[in-house]
């Protein structure tokens, strides 16, 4: 097991040190869709970096950073998910209204996931729940006994209404 960690660590270190170091002009041929640039005007050695193109929108999130970013994002994804769920849980603890949840950018399926963990009677994901409802695998009055499902259904209706009215909020959670 330790050997596996050593190999993965070495691979990450190798990718981190060589990411973007190799000269793009020597390794890759210019495609017909690439913007022709003289070698003097290239501000970096990285291949297909968005700052080198005239369509640069200034957003660093749209920049291609290579293997290191992919590995970092894969490692940080569970932490971001936990942070979002904690934010939603804090809103629920403060008895936030539907409008406050919507203003915070909470999507209905994320609200259901957070409520589901607080309510012991809900032991399945939203997609499993909806599938069972449509297949009539348990009585319909069972659904309405769950506070989690009632809260989710109320917020989902509010969310859909706001989306239909064109009052869109950037989804942050």
Swiss-Prot record:
Signal peptide segment: 1-24
Q: Where is the composition biased (Basic and acidic residues)?
A: 37-49
Query: Cellular location of this protein?
Result: Secreted; Host nucleus; Host cytoplasm
On induction, the UniProt comment says: Expression is induced during host plant infection.
* Stretch list, region Disordered: 25-64
Q: Where is the motif named RxLR-dEER mapped on this chain? A: 46-65
Report TM segments: none
Hey, which family's this protein in?
Belongs to the RxLR effector family.
Q: What is known of its domains?
A: The RxLR-dEER motif acts to carry the protein into the host cell cytoplasm through binding to cell surface phosphatidylinositol-3-phosphate.
Please give the function described in this protein's UniProt entry: Effector that leads to host programmed cell death.
Q: Quote the protein name from its UniProt record.
A: RxLR effector protein PITG_10232
What organism does this protein naturally occur in? Phytophthora infestans (strain T30-4) (Potato late blight agent)
